[in-house]
């Protein structure tokens, strides 16, 4: 018998009628009325669409339909009541996971952010003179001390730092850069596009794999405003290659009265090569080569908040501070608080390796990782019992964040093979958990890398896996 859509539609209860249901009255006591009402209307609209498309799926009685709607509203309200930005246990082994928020802040940085957010502060107030101050002065002395430069400026990310530098130094004029350095920095943002937005004109020189000093020299004209060096922090070209050194580029710039800028991308303040990582130039070394401006990120290898950090010659950086664009890309008090606290950790470089989570995760030894894996596997094995096979095996982690692209630090994974649940269902349940858990899937197993799992997350992670494997859905 063909169902009459109008008759089925009339079975749908009104909003006010639903709000008088006992379950929804309880929801109204726990959550804002506007949230519950919005959820009711959303679910009702979904049922209207179901009636039009598949009326046979609608429960036969008005009472059954109301019960189904109430259940869906309850689920919807609880989902909407959760913060959109949620905690995630990063079990991927990717230390600077861009999609999971990159660097985890140090304890001191967290306390500094809380202090700045919870109270008024001297963000732009000079406590000595009683007059207006500069927010950039809050980290200037630290950055000058740590990098050996004359001045600094902090903006909201490194792309903004590059944009501001190009806009200030080369708007309407030419910037020379090696063809092999025209990088894409993530999210489809590319150096040529950033340059176009700044108003500067790109002049490519050399080939993808080889660029010589003569290529730069031959491209210099009266329209040239800047020589740009972009460090390949997120990729490597190997084999038949040649790149002009910074010292050579600086000498050429001075010969022609042109400033030289280096975009480091990630930006190190400590050398990690002693831990087996490929050599990368530090900010100090880059600035020491004589370049006029260096730009780098705050939330990558520095281990701080998202920020674009500009250091260099005072005359050049001061020009950037006066650019109207600076106001549009400036940082807030919480970023500056976190950055200052992070930079202070670097006054004790050895201590920074332990206190800054990013550096601690990158420098952790194989013995420590193996012990962490053994403890986590023991907890999981005891909790999951015969519901899953738990094991350990050697593998590799990743640095992430567009940094150290060829590095593959060794690790020891904890593997989980569920017996009564597909991996697709398991990973979906873990993503829906609170906190969510994100690992990697290899060879039909869930793999958990202890490099990026904090010790105090072991019990939480074990409990989450216990719940999702023990609840039939």
Swiss-Prot record:
The record's SUPFAM superfamilies line, in alphabetical order, gives: PLP-dependent transferases
Write out the annotated subcellular location.
Cytoplasm
Q: What is its main location?
A: cytoplasm
Gene Ontology terms describing biological process? conversion of seryl-tRNAsec to selenocys-tRNAsec; selenocysteine incorporation
Source species of the chain: Desulforudis audaxviator (strain MP104C)
Kindly provide the name given to this protein in its UniProt entry: L-seryl-tRNA(Sec) selenium transferase
Q: Residue positions of the PTM N6-(pyridoxal phosphate)lysine?
A: 300
Q: What is the protein's known function? A: Converts seryl-tRNA(Sec) to selenocysteinyl-tRNA(Sec) required for selenoprotein biosynthesis.
Key words, A-Z: Cytoplasm, Protein biosynthesis, Pyridoxal phosphate, Selenium, Transferase
For this protein, what reaction is catalysed?
A: L-seryl-tRNA(Sec) + selenophosphate + H(+) = L-selenocysteinyl-tRNA(Sec) + phosphate
Q: Which NCBIfam families match?
A: selA
Give the domain of life.
Answer: Bacteria
Tell me the protein family, please.
Answer: Belongs to the SelA family.
* HAMAP family named in the record: SelA
Which coenzyme or cofactor does it need? pyridoxal 5'-phosphate
**PANTHER family assigned to the protein according to its UniProt record, in alphabetical order:** L-SERYL-TRNA(SEC) SELENIUM TRANSFERASE
Q: Does the keyword Amino-acid biosynthesis apply?
A: no
The GO cellular component terms are: cytoplasm
């Amino acid at each position: 018998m063909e169902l009459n859509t109008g008759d089925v539609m009339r079975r749908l209860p009104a909003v006010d009628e639903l709000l008088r249901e006992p379950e929804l009255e309880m929801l109204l006591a726990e959550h804002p009325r506007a949230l519950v009402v919005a959820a009711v209307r959303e679910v009702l609209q979904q049922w209207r669409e179901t009636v039009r498309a598949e009326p046979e799926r609608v429960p036969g009685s008005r009472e059954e339909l109301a019960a189904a709607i109430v259940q869906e509203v309850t689920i919807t309200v609880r989902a909407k009541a959760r913060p959109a930005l949620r905690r995630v246990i990063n079990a991927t082994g990717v230390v600077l996971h861009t999609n999971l928020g990159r660097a985890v802040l140090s304890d001191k940085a967290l306390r500094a952010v809380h202090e700045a957010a919870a109270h008024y502060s001297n963000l732009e107030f000079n406590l000595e003179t009683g007059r207006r101050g500069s927010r950039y002065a809050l980290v200037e002395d630290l950055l000058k001390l740590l990098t050996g430069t004359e001045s600094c400026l902090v903006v909201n990310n490194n792309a903004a730092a590059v944009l501001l530098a190009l806009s200030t130094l080369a708007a309407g004029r030419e910037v020379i850069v090696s063809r092999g350095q025209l990088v894409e920095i993530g999210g489809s943002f590319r150096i040529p596009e950033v340059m176009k937005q700044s108003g500067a004109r790109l002049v490519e020189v050399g080939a993808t794999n080889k660029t010589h000093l003569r290529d730069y020299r031959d491209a210099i004209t009266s329209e040239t405003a800047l020589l740009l060096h972009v460090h390949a922090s997120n990729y490597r070209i190997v084999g038949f290659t040649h790149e002009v050194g910074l010292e050579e580029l600086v000498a050429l710039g001075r010969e022609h009265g042109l400033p030289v800028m280096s975009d480091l991308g990630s930006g190190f303040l400590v050398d990690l090569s002693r831990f087996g990582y490929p050599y990368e130039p530090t900010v100090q070394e880059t600035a020491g080569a004589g370049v006029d401006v260096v730009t780098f990120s705050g939330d990558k290898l520095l281990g701080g908040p998202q920020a674009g950090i500009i250091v260099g010659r005072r005359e050049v950086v001061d020009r950037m501070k006066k650019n109207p664009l600076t106001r549009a890309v400036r940082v807030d008090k919480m970023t500056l608080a976190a950055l200052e606290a992070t930079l202070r950790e670097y006054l004790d470089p050895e201590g920074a390796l332990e206190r800054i989570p990013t550096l601690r995760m990158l420098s952790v030894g194989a013995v420590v990782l193996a012990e962490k894996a053994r403890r986590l596997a023991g907890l999981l094995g005891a909790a999951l019992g015969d519901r899953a096979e738990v094991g350990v095996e050697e593998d590799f982690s990743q640095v992430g964040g567009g940094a150290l692209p060829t590095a593959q630090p060794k690790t020891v994974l904890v593997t989980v093979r569920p017996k009564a649940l597909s991996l697709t269902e398991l990973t979906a349940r873990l993503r829906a958990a609170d906190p969510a858990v994100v690992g990697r899937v290899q060879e039909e197993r869930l793999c958990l890398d202890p490099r990026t799992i904090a010790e105090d997350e072991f019990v939480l992670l074990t409990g989450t896996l216990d719940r999702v494997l023990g609840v039939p859905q």
